[in-house]
Amino acid sequence: MVEFAPLLVPWERRLQTFAVLQWVFSFLALAQLCIVIFVGLLFTRFWLFSVLYATWWYLDWDKPRQGGRPIQFFRRLAIWKYMKDYFPVSLVKTAELDPSRNYIAGFHPHGVLAAGAFLNLCTESTGFTSLFPGIRSYLMMLTVWFRAPFFRDYIMSGGLVSSEKVSADHILSRKGGGNLLAIIVGGAQEALDARPGAYRLLLKNRKGFIRLALMHGAALVPIFSFGENNLFNQVENTPGTWLRWIQNRLQKIMGISLPLFHGRGVFQYSFGLMPFRQPITTIVGKPIEVQMTPQPSREEVDRLHQRYIKELCKLFEEHKLKFNVPEDQHLEFC
């Protein structure tokens, strides 16, 4: 039976719902819409607009691999505050970050739509720069999304950058420090395991970010986002099922995963693509000091990788009881 939302809802909550609705639309369909508009304009009297943009696009092609184009005005827009209050989302600091250093932050888990990563690291809705003065945050995103006209400029405004190695090298090589490059380590594939109560992380063989940290001497910061997996339900797709096989194949072909998720609707609570109103608390752990090693050996990478996993588990265990995680629940790695 469908459970409808009440008619008399405070304007504050309506604005929160609208803020999340536009974000879900942006995540699922804005890139495709931008491509349609770009091509469509070529067949109208406004064709010159697309031609001029194409020229700009050509000249600006490498920008996503060169730190992007973060705009503070965009990051501070009121709409992100409303989106943050919808869940709500909060950011917790457990240690100081020295603004003279550069950092690689591993963000866990991905969730379905990475709401916590976006709000905490690409907007000022949770006060990132107030908690970590002198630190500029960047978040890596699949390169394919920067191939969409107009959309690329939109996502770069929040501090999103291409997930290529050259992009990471550019940010981590900046003199003077103060840069935090966040990587959702589990990536698109981990989204296929995002469901309420899931604590399975795709990390066991993900060592590229460890190698980057060693090559640049960037401190590693583990981040765990409690509640990230509680925003949506997902159609059963355990490994070995035909659905999971199809999803894995599509992920290898396209580079993006296609989780069959569902949440609530705008006017009812029973079904839809809107996330549930579930709190997200993102805990930023203590940085792990890393000695610069321009050409790290496999043993050095493995050693630091194990230390990172140990610190991530410690962070999870220290805080899990505050968020109603069972005492016997531990992180699982695959």
Swiss-Prot record:
Family: Belongs to the diacylglycerol acyltransferase family.
Protein name: 2-acylglycerol O-acyltransferase 2
CDD domains, alphabetized: LPLAT_MGAT-like
Gene: Mogat2
EC number: 2.3.1.20, 2.3.1.22
Keyword list, A-Z: Acyltransferase, Cytoplasm, Endoplasmic reticulum, Glycerol metabolism, Lipid biosynthesis, Lipid metabolism, Membrane, Transferase, Transmembrane, Transmembrane helix
GO cellular component: endoplasmic reticulum; endoplasmic reticulum membrane; perinuclear endoplasmic reticulum membrane
Organism: Mus musculus (Mouse)
InterPro entries: DAGAT
Transmembrane residue ranges: 23-43, 212-232
GO BP of this protein: diacylglycerol biosynthetic process; glycerol metabolic process; intestinal absorption; lipid metabolic process; monoacylglycerol biosynthetic process; monoacylglycerol metabolic process; triglyceride biosynthetic process
Pathway(s): Glycerolipid metabolism; triacylglycerol biosynthesis
Record text on activity regulation: Inhibited by oleic acid and sphingosine, while it is stimulated by phosphatidylcholine, phosphatidylserine and phosphatidic acid.
